[in-house]
Regions:
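Surface-exposed polar/charged interaction patches
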Residues: 48, 52, 125, 167-170
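Short linear interaction motifs
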Residues: 121-133
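Broad gene-expression machinery/nucleic-acid interaction feature
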Residues: 57, 69, 128, 144-146
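Alpha-helical oligomerization segments
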Residues: 130-173
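Extended, low-hydrophobicity segments enriched in charged/polar residues
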Residues: 1-121
């Protein structure tokens, strides 16, 4: 999760999405509804973000450990339908507010077509997970409501804002 931290993001802070953890010049937001019936645009955006497959990593919540019984309860998120998950690294973070420990997994070498398939499934109404895809340049946060993109380089976000000026969410721009 070191790579996530290089974006200025605290992934473990599940109370605040990554979008609100960075300045407005380093982020762009799309409502997922703009991709309904328009997944070609979604594909173009993902192709722009992730040029080479070998650089893509993902981190997501896989479960939690209750402070009461100290047993892990896994989320049934079905990511294996979209992502090839061989080697993952687990990180546990105590969350005092929820009175449990959140268990995160990080996976390397994600295929960009799998990123697209997952995002497309969310557009089509599939249940979401708290998940991010990232490389050295971009971080993509996906939920049922929004597709948030973060970059360390303001020029990258400017390019996206110019290319998709008619569809990105300008409320927080």
């Amino acid at each position: 999760m070191k790579k996530i931290n290089s974006f200025g993001i605290e992934f473990e802070n599940s109370s605040t999405t990554p979008f609100f953890q960075v300045g407005e010049k380093n982020r762009i937001r799309f409502g997922m509804d703009v991709f309904e019936g328009n997944t070609k645009t979604l594909k173009k955006i993902i192709d722009f973000l992730f040029v080479r497959n070998e650089e893509i990593e993902s981190s997501f919540i896989i479960g939690d450990i209750s402070n009461l019984n100290n047993k892990i309860r896994y989320n049934k998120i079905g990511l294996s339908k979209f992502l090839k998950i061989n080697n993952w690294k687990e990180t546990s973070v105590v969350n005092d507010d929820l009175e449990c420990t959140i268990v995160f997994a990080s996976v390397k070498n994600i295929n960009k077509n799998d990123v697209f398939s997952y995002c497309k499934s969310i557009v089509l109404g599939r249940s979401q997970s708290y998940i991010m895809f990232y490389n050295d340049t971009f971080l993509l946060y996906v939920s049922s409501d929004v597709l948030d993109i973060i970059s360390k380089e303001e020029d990258n976000i400017d390019t996206l804002k110019i290319n998709y000026s008619d569809i990105y969410d300008k409320r927080y721009a």
